[in-house]
Amino acid sequence: MASSASSLHFLSLTPQTLLLPKPTSQTTSLSFFSLPPSSLNLSLSSPSSCFSSRFVRKVTLPDFDQIEDVEDGDEGVEEERNFSPDLKIFVGNLLFSADSAALAELFERAGNVEMVEVIYDKLTGRSRGFGFVTMSSKEEVEAACQQFNGYELDGRALRVNSGPPPEKRENSSFRENSSFRGGSRGGGSFDSSNRVYVGNLAWGVDQDALETLFSEQGKVVDAKVVYDRDSGRSRGFGFVTYSSAEEVNNAIESLDGVDLNGRAIRVSPAEARPPRRQF
């Protein structure tokens, strides 16, 4: 066929009777009924892409208006499939030019990708540097996190985390902040007065790096980097909790001004946290 899609048109027929004469005296009549003008479209398109079985979304913030392309060939699909939150993966530190197709192609190496979302700013239309990938099973989620956390995509090391943000502690003075990788290391209660504030952190520093550095000065009960709940990016500061006040003093004296990933960190008692600087 010359074109990629063809249409067969049915003409409107008015009620009428067609008489067919026969050798006998009897006649046979065939009745035709009125049909409204209509068109039957037969689409001849190119083979479906490798992402034809999933949704690929472009989501804008802050009110999450979205444009949704359903690429499974079924024009009757009106509602998005619901997936378990356990199957959703956060992907941060994306290059602004990275789109959902690039993410889908990458994460398919770890399993079947059900849906991909890249978050865009509604006003500027630019990517906000993070998105979400939904896999088919928990095993694939674990495989993707292990395989792609720290993976370099277009020159940037991805941050890949699974599951919902951890529950916030009631005694926390920073309840508005949510970390995709947080929570108490010790699994028990601790004295918040033995906590130090750590500022001027490089964006790539995570809680593991904090714990490694601060464990040189004592027993680290808890280490946390604070992340922005919308972008998923580090806010450039965090907290470390020790088991005693003596360890807190040692950490402040020894680590304040120490270079960590190219930046001189600021260490002070959490209660006397200095105001944040703009970088």
Swiss-Prot record:
CDD domains, per database record = RRM2_NsCP33_like (cd21608)
Pfam families xref list: RRM_1 (PF00076)
Q: Which GO terms describe its biological process?
A: chloroplast rRNA processing; mRNA processing
In terms of InterPro entries, this protein maps to: Euk_RNA-bind_prot, Nucleotide-bd_a/b_plait_sf, RBD_domain_sf, RRM2_NsCP33-like, RRM_dom
UniProt keyword annotation of Plastid present: yes
Keywords for this protein: Chloroplast, mRNA processing, Plastid, Repeat, Ribonucleoprotein, RNA-binding, Transit peptide
Q: Segment Disordered: which positions?
A: 156-187
Q: Main role?
A: Could be involved in splicing and/or processing of chloroplast RNA's.
PANTHER family in the record, alphabetically? Answer: OS02G0815200 PROTEIN (PTHR48025), RRM DOMAIN-CONTAINING PROTEIN (PTHR48025:SF1)
Q: What is this protein called?
A: 30 kDa ribonucleoprotein, chloroplastic
